[in-house]
Design a protein with these regions (language model features):
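Surface-exposed ligand/attachment interfaces on beta-rich extracellular proteins
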Residues: 43-53, 60-82, 91-114, 157-169
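Intrinsic low-complexity, repeat-rich intrinsically disordered segments enriched
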Residues: 1-65, 89, 93-98
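Residues that act as N-cap/strand-start positions at coil-to-secondary-structure junctions
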Residues: 12, 25, 71-73, 133
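Substrate-binding and catalytic surfaces of secreted/luminal carbohydrate-active proteins
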Residues: 86
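Short, structured beta-strand segments at or near domain termini in extracellular proteins/domains
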Residues: 169-181
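Generic beta-strand structural signal
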Residues: 26, 35, 81, 140-142
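Terminal beta-strand-rich extracellular "head" domains
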Residues: 92-145, 150-151
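Residue-level detector of beta-strand structural context in well-folded domains
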Residues: 16, 22, 75-77, 137
Length: 181
């Protein structure tokens, strides 16, 4: 039932669209969009965007992996998806990296868009027990399928994508990466 200042209206009396001359406040409950692909329309705002419809929001967990032959002590990930933008956070503690494993992180809740630039950056918040001498460890999202680690070694001048040999025993990493789907 919709209550107005002067009277009440039953649900079967409401016709869409409803235009109200001010703010709408829900004192309890949620605003539920009942049709897939619909959302909050921001087209009344200035700008020249290609889309002004917020049609998706999701939070959840995922399980990051560097391959089926690795053994893990900790393996957890969290994500937030707003529209076509995804932010991943994850923690890995790898007990042993075995053949068939790599520095490619799989198990993503959403694949990066094949239409985005080849490399979309992230940040490694913490890394410990790299098997090789490295000045830094970075992370990026590859268009279409996965995220991957890279390092800048003390013996080279540029960044290189690494094989699983870069991961040492009890390798710890906390990282975040953002990309479009």
């Amino acid at each position: 039932m919709l209550k107005t200042v002067t009277n009440s209206i039953n649900a079967n009396q409401i016709q869409t669209p409803i235009t109200l001359p001010g703010d709408v406040t829900l004192s309890t409950g949620n605003l539920v969009i009942g049709t897939s692909g619909k959302g909050i329309d921001f087209s009344a705002t200035p700008g020249t965007g290609t889309s002004e419809l917020l049609a998706d929001y999701e939070e959840g967990t995922w399980t990051p992996s560097v391959g089926s032959n690795a053994t893990y002590i900790a393996q957890s990930g969290y994500y937030t998806k707003i529209g076509n933008f995804v932010k991943l956070r994850f923690i890995l503690t790898i007990d042993a990296i075995n053949s068939g494993s790599s520095t490619t992180i799989t198990g993503l809740p959403f694949n990066p868009s094949a239409n985005q630039p080849v490399i979309v950056g992230g940040v490694v918040c913490y890394a410990n027990n790299l098997a090789t001498a490295a000045l830094s460890l970075g992370i990026y999202a590859q268009n279409g399928s996965f995220i991957r680690f890279f390092t800048r070694n003390t013996s080279s001048t540029g960044a290189t994508t690494q094989s699983a040999a870069v991961i040492g025993t009890l390798f710890d990493v906390y990282a975040e990466v953002s990309y479009q789907v």
